[in-house]
Amino acid sequence: MESFLTEIQINVLNLRKRGHTQDEIANIMGTSRANISMIEKRARENIEKARNTLSIYNDIIAPSKIKIDKGTDVFSIPKIIFSKSDQEEIHVNYSSLQIMEFVNQNAQRYIKNRMVVEPFVVTILQNGDIFVHDYEESEENEKMPKKEI
């Protein structure tokens, strides 16, 4: 399978996942720890670029985007998502509890004490998956109008 990672990067990441140190990996591969460090760093950079690419692509193809405004109570987010998905006739693949968990894991930096402190966007894909990303990032990708949902 084609990938943004080289075989060596994949091997290094697999060994790191198994708990090996960079020194141990360097000994296994017959190279220096500094080289392994650079290989791992570039692999992680490539992974981040791939994630960003997917985020941009999902933003482009998404039939529905919801701006979650500053001051929104976190507990109202599932209702907002379900309301928008019903309007768009998209079945969201998650329950309210799963959405709350998803928001907690993926939008922590936008939330404090149950309240949204920085606006963000929830993207709903046609297949019912949801993603969270920066509001500014979404504006750049599609010049999304600033309106309350």
UniProtKB/Swiss-Prot annotation:
One of its GO terms (biological process) is DNA-templated transcription initiation. Keywords: DNA-binding, Transcription, Transcription regulation. It holds the Pfam family TFX_C. One of its GO terms (molecular function) is DNA binding. InterPro entries: RNA_pol_sigma70_r4 (IPR007630), Tfx_C (IPR029291), Tfx_DNA-bd_arc (IPR004645), Tfx_DNA-bd_euryarc (IPR018384), Tfx_DNA-bd_sf_arc (IPR036657). SUPFAM superfamilies: DNA-binding protein Tfx. Gene3D superfamilies: DNA-binding protein Tfx superfamily, archaea. Coiled coil: none annotated. Disulfide bonds: none annotated. Belongs to the Tfx family. Putative transcriptional regulator. This is Putative transcriptional regulatory protein MMP0086.
